[in-house]
Amino acid sequence: NLRFGVERMRTAFRASAGRPPAERVALLEAEAARFEEEDREACAAMGRHGAAWIAAHLGADPAGPLRVLTHCNAGALATTGVGTALGVVRALAAGRPVAVFADETRPFWQGARLTAWELAKDGIDVTILPDVAAASVIASGKVSVAVVGADRIAANGDVANKVGTYGVALACRAHGVPFVVAAPRTTLDSACPTGRDIPIEWRDGAEVLLLDPAGESPLSVAPAGVPALYPAFDVTPAALVDAIVTEAGLSTAPHADGLARLLALP
């Protein structure tokens, strides 16, 4: 989605060639404003579609709050609107009590620092989970549904997202918990056949060995000289994804035909 936005602005910049500088700036600002509004509307639509599917899939309201697990941050801090995954959470919370488990998302703590902050600010009940506790909490029956975002979705429905997402999906499938992905259509990559074709970023393993690696005084949490591996993303197979929610509608497994249909919409 970020690449799409950059390319859109580059196209607008090239199209404005030959115009006076002030006019070019105004045209680019107008294009950025349109993009912002479209993203805001897309987030709201994803929220509606996702909340409707979850309500229909889970049936009658539970005795207590609907318990949603999410991983990393896919909210207002990552979009111009209410977010993708958190847009679904917010839409759910508008109609029923919701309690959220936010995976902490080591080593940069996007879940603890960003997702938890967003939800608490909105008055939505949120509890931070250590990443390693997600499967256990899912197995305990405390999670009604998992909702995550996506960085890239292959044509067959394989989903690349923050590392740890795959483990959440596996636990959900093992214990009968719906696993939902929310992402704009620009995240769907028809030119990428499967998740095997998605390159995974491997970051400096030292980031895993430090507490608050981006802080001013990071603290080592491992013996000196011991290495670490840090793939920043993983790929969840399409077969583990119950629904992929976009602003144009959603796809349910198997996803190849459903995603092609969504991409073909105007």
Could you tell me what each predicted segment is?
Residues 1-129:
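N-terminal active-site beta-alpha-beta segment that forms phosphate/nucleotide-binding
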Residues 97-98, 103-266:
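Conserved phosphate- and dinucleotide-binding cores of soluble alpha/beta proteins
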